[in-house]
Amino acid sequence: MKEGIHPQVHRAKVHCACGESFETTSTRKEIKVDVCSKCHPFFTGKSRTVEVGGRVDRFKKKYGL
């Protein structure tokens, strides 16, 4: 392997939107994610509510049309 061409690997702290955090290795020191194994429906066994309606419906609701 060549010297000096590989990125530095650090212990990275991963922060989820649900408030959970854990450590892993990465080239970044801090990582922010939207979903982790503590809050993802596949791992929790709970289903999420699926938003009914498309973009047009959301636009009309947002602007009162």
UniProtKB/Swiss-Prot annotation:
Keyword Ribonucleoprotein: yes
Binding site for Zn(2+): C16, C18, C36, C39
Top-level taxon in the UniProt lineage: Bacteria
Molecular function, one GO term: rRNA binding
Cofactor: Zn(2+)
Transmembrane segments: none
Record keywords, A-Z: Metal-binding, Ribonucleoprotein, Ribosomal protein, RNA-binding, rRNA-binding, Zinc
Quaternary structure and partners: Part of the 50S ribosomal subunit.
Protein name per the record: Large ribosomal subunit protein bL31
Organism, scientific name: Heliobacterium modesticaldum (strain ATCC 51547 / Ice1)
